């Protein structure tokens, strides 16, 4: 067998395994989310199907498959059908670029589907393409509520994609690479400097807020706001097409969790301070990556259970007036520290720890000025009554 063919078959096999793992995780994440929401809301949650409700995802899958697939009369049939496929396809493709271990650690092969030098840039591009599925689904439904939901999703993606990209720019300047393996090894490899959360906590806060907005989760779930848009872009979808959109949303949550774990918490590398207790524990790549992803997925569920939904005007102001300028400030601060502070640091403080202190100070200033900052995105725009043109009275002349 030619080398190129064997490499292609191995890549396809890894892609299938990643897809199966993600879809299985999606099924049980829905169960875990419903059980956790039940505990938070002082109710049991789903616990009837199978032992302790463990077969509930199977029951949900059977129900979705055998429900009637209703198609709207005015829908563009081809685009209406392709939209959920595009959404789940982009979500699965994006996750394939996250490394689950060092090279050759998966039965002698590399534990990723693809590895690009511009890894973080490619992944951000793929995640932003997922909004095409949402927009096309809303547009092709031939109804006003899905159209409004898809327009909201497009505006939301544009607003927070810029802040997300700028928030990691400082991190990339520190590491000097956009490759995920280089980022992980810079943090926790043999010559690791420490997790980037220690030096870029301000950037992490901005990235986390942008991630919540990118995956359309509470408090940023405006595209499918039930009280305003029935179900948003999902209004005219049912059966397996609706399930595909739900899969895409949860896979995007897993991708965002894996991104935060890889960029700021060492990815597949564990903490080295546990080595004296359990030798080799920091070198369990898959275990540590899954544990970190699970923590952030729990955070998504916790936020959904506790925070209310923002208004649409608040959402846009938060993205353009707060997240984007602060991400730009963080980028300029990192550039200034790297340009003007010597590598050995100042006053006996290493440059990295000095940058970490500045980043923490920026976050504390933001919290201290929270009341003033909230006014940037919470207060509605007021009309100038003096310049207001009087309207024509109702009922004619």
Curated annotation (Swiss-Prot):
GO terms for biological process: aerobic respiration. PANTHER family: NADH DEHYDROGENASE SUBUNIT 1, NADH-UBIQUINONE OXIDOREDUCTASE CHAIN 1. GO terms for cellular component: plasma membrane. It is found in: Cell membrane. This is NADH-quinone oxidoreductase subunit H. One of its GO terms (molecular function) is oxidoreductase activity, acting on NAD(P)H, quinone or similar compound as acceptor. Signal peptide: none annotated. NDH-1 shuttles electrons from NADH, via FMN and iron-sulfur (Fe-S) centers, to quinones in the respiratory chain. The immediate electron acceptor for the enzyme in this species is believed to be ubiquinone. Couples the redox reaction to proton translocation (for every two electrons transferred, four hydrogen ions are translocated across the cytoplasmic membrane), and thus conserves the redox energy in a proton gradient. This subunit may bind ubiquinone. Belongs to the complex I subunit 1 family. NDH-1 is composed of 15 different subunits. Subunits NuoA, H, J, K, L, M, N constitute the membrane sector of the complex. It catalyses: a quinone + NADH + 5 H(+)(in) = a quinol + NAD(+) + 4 H(+)(out). Its EC number is 7.1.1.-. The gene is nuoH. The chain crosses the membrane at residues 7-27, 78-98, 120-140, 164-184, 195-215, 247-267, 283-303, 322-342, 353-373. It is an enzyme of class 7 (translocase). It is a multi-pass membrane protein. It comes from Deinococcus radiodurans (strain ATCC 13939 / DSM 20539 / JCM 16871 / CCUG 27074 / LMG 4051 / NBRC 15346 / NCIMB 9279 / VKM B-1422 / R1). Pfam families: NADHdh (PF00146). Keywords: Cell membrane, Membrane, NAD, Quinone, Translocase, Transmembrane, Transmembrane helix, Ubiquinone.
